[in-house]
UniProtKB/Swiss-Prot annotation:
PANTHER family: CITRATE SYNTHASE. The gene is gltA. GO terms for molecular function: citrate (Si)-synthase activity. PROSITE patterns: CITRATE_SYNTHASE (PS00480). It comes from Helicobacter pylori (strain J99 / ATCC 700824). This is Citrate synthase.
Length: 426
């Protein structure tokens, strides 16, 4: 099938082939548009442009659906652990049995330690440096420790590179946090599961499972591990978003893969991308009380006010974000099972959501709660500091970046990214 483009100036007709998709709309192959017509396509933000063909994740924005390699996100969250989802994204296959699942996880656990020299680098940062700045730098430094990943040839080479960074990113992130607060570094405990180990490195004390002495709480509960596991799964991949596209673009230059991942971390840092969950919680704090919600909703509608309600709306979803639905259910479940929530912020969030889902202003603009709206309150309940919300996103998304990178570098269509411009200067 083809599409005909007609130039109304000279009635010239040009035929362009379409590309079939297994899900979603077809695409028109405009790769030879300039060569054929002398025109570029102009698409700021690339909202109508597909830069690659992918088998990793698919979003149906109208129906509110998300798939990882053909599997519904709801099924993956309900039936599989995050490490199983990592295996799916990297290899295309879920584990066939518990032994395969454990084998993959044990490899991640054993690769979780980082070179001691990295500790000196983290200590050199100012105490107020944002953890995302430190994390991006730490991953970039990893490229100097594993220079062989610059030249990969076999599938085993690619998988080793990806599994190594997926294993080490939680350790690097935990070091960033503990370095910031001046707490002793907690080394990975390979006797713990991959996900429990993350909470342990963030909240633990050396030689003890004690978390917060003032609250008299000991250990990390299975319920907390399960909740955190689901959060990571929900953040594992999400199509060609800004950070994933950044990883692909940087990788297209032939750079070390960890440098491309570092660039993805920098892209995710932005408050319009991964930093949004941090902004949601800060905004709920700003609202302060349920009685103030109406006033802030009015500000959203005021054309003369630049105030934006964080945690609502999405570039792709024009209905309820399926990840947000899952997180809302998870938040309610944690509350019912006795996990301590910030009641004040939870009440404010519930009131904001109640109004937004009924108000025509939000409905007409497809402003539904997104994944960031609920993740912050859950992370706080898991005693994750607000400044560390975005690094948690990095932990979950690193495997998706690796999958995107591998798909790009192994594609026969791979070439260095070089967009055009419409020059309007002198």
């Amino acid at each position: 099938m083809s599409v005909t483009l007609i130039n109304n100036e000279n009635n010239a007709r040009y035929e362009f082939e379409t590309i079939e998709c297994t899900r979603g709309p077809k695409a028109v192959d405009f790769s030879k548009l300039f060569e054929t017509t002398g025109f570029f396509s102009y698409d700021p933000g690339y909202s109508s442009t597909a830069g690659c063909q992918s088998k990793i994740s698919y979003i149906n924005g109208k129906k509110g659906e998300l798939y990882y390699r053909g599997h519904r996100i709801e099924d993956l969250v309900a039936k599989y652990k995050y490490v199983d989802v990592c295996r799916l994204l990297l290899t295309g296959e879920l584990p066939k049995n518990q032994d395969e699942s454990l084998e993959f996880e044990l490899e991640l656990r054993h690769r979780s330690f980082v070179h001691e020299s990295l500790l000196n680098m983290f200590s050199a940062f100012p105490s107020n440096a944002h953890p995302m700045a430190k994390l991006s730098s730490g991953v970039s430094i990893l490229s100097t420790l594993y220079s062989t990943h610059q030249n990969m040839h076999t599938e085993e080479d690619y998988q080793t590179m990806a599994r190594r960074i997926v294993a080490k990113i939680p350790t690097l992130a935990a070091i960033c946090y503990r370095n910031e607060v001046g707490a002793p570094i907690i080394y990975p405990d390979i006797a713990r599961s991959y996900v429990e180990n993350i909470l342990f490195m963030l909240r633990g004390y050396p030689y003890s499972r004690l978390k917060h002495t003032t609250q008299g709480e000991v250990g990390i509960t299975p319920l907390e591990v399960e909740a955190f596991d689901k959060i990571l799964t929900l953040h594992a991949d999400h199509g060609q978003n800004a950070s994933s596209t950044t990883v692909r673009n940087v990788a297209s230059t032939g750079v070390h893969p960890y440098a491309a991942i570092s660039a993805g971390i920098s892209a995710l840092w932005g408050h319009l991308h991964g930093g949004a969950n941090e902004k949601v919680l800060l905004q709920l704090e700003e609202i302060g009380d349920v009685k103030n919600v109406d006033k802030y909703i009015a500000r959203v509608k005021d054309k003369n006010d630049n105030f934006k309600l964080m945690g609502f709306g999405h570039r792709v979803y024009k209905s309820y974000d399926p990840r947000a639905k899952i997180l809302k259910g998870l938040k309610d479940e944690l509350h019912q099972k006795g996990v301590k929530m910030d009641e004040r912020l939870s009440e404010i969030a519930a009131k904001v959501e109640e109004i937004a889902l009924k108000d025509e202003y939000f409905i007409e603009r497809n402003l539904y709660p997104n994944v960031d709206f609920y993740s912050g309150t859950i992370l706080r309940a898991l005693k994750i500091p607000v400044r560390f919300f975005t690094p948690v996103f990095v932990i979950g998304r690193t495997v998706g970046w690796c999958a995107q990178l591998l798909e790009h570098v192994k594609s026969p269509q791979a070439r260095i990214t070089r967009p055009r411009q419409v020059y309007v200067g002198d």
